[in-house]
Structures are given as structure tokens and as C-alpha cells.
């Protein structure tokens, strides 16, 4: 079905290669890293003005940026972010968008270290297919049922009117005060009459804390991949 949309000319593909980004961070001059080509901004302006829907098919290369000077990578991001932020904000706040995962060999090695690379990749695909209900007779109905379940839990959380959330375990000892008017939100969002999922798959139920109401220690016990660099378990302290 996705390929058939090309018949109406409604699909535009923007491909980004992280290996090219790595090469640029390593070898490009600082002037090149700081340069934001006009065509990038023109594309964002055109697509947002047309109220396009955005699908980001994202994968992860967990160790790709190891050995890269992060100051140079940060330099490039700092040049890009201010110029693209108005369009990114418009996408996030007014348009329909979704991020979906696509496994890579590198990613599967981290998730399934007990498998050979090829077998790990296939296992990754099989698990994603199951989690996204694509193995069901009617995947859309199955995922809609899941969203209805999340919506039921969301309403229950709102009915509790929690004052404070307390997290303990694994070294974590954290209290999170919630605003009186806080509301819980599930993974589905609306734009007019349309419903979309910012993240697929989704198990999300979330709210916001009181501005100065977070205190204690949060221990992240699983490695995280951030912009191509693995961050091992670490601790955050809030006061």
C-alpha cells in the first residue's frame, strides 16, 4: 500500500545515511560542518506548508560514533537546530508524524548478543512483527484494541489525581510531584478528526512533573545509545 501512494505523487523520500554523517564529522572542515544548505530549509518549509504527514523509519547503529570528536558533531547540530526548529516545532505541534523502528545488524548484536549476526537480525524482525501485531489476522484491529486498553488505563490514572509518584529499586530513590491540573496522555494523539501514533510500537502513558518537584536519585540500569554512542548505566541526581 505504501508503494502504491507513489502513483499520486504524494510520497517524497528523504534518506539520511549515518555513515556519511560520521565521515563528515571526522573529515569535513568546520565551515562545512556549520553550513546549513538552503535546500534543507526549503524542503521543510514546503512540506510543512502542505501539511504533510511524516513517517520516520529509524534504525540504530549503537557504536557508530565511537572515536568521533563529539565537539565537531555538536558543532554541526548547533548550526542546524536553530534554523530547522520552527519547522520541527510545527511538525510536532500541528501535523501528523510517526517514528517506526527498522532493525540493523549492529543494533541486533546489542539486543541479541547470544545470536549470530544474521540470526539476531531475524529474531529482531520477528519480535517487532509480534509487538506491532503484524502477525495478527487483522493487525489494524489488534493494534486498535491495544490502544483502547491504553486509553482505559489513561482514564484510570487521571481519576486517581496523584499528588506524588515515588520510584524505588535498583538504586533509584526518586519522588516526582505532579501539578494539581496534570493530565495523563497515552501514545495516540489527534489532529482534528485524525488519530496518529508518534511512536510505533507504543506502550506510552505519560504526564509532566511539577517544575521544581523532582528530587532524589535515578539510576539508569540499561545501556543507552545516544547519537551513535553507547552510554553505560549512569546516575542522575535531582534537587
Residue ranges of model-derived segments:
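Active-site bordering "gate/hinge" segments
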Residues: 1-214
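Long, well-ordered mid-to-C-terminal structural blocks that present hydrophobic/aromatic surfaces
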Residues: 210-239
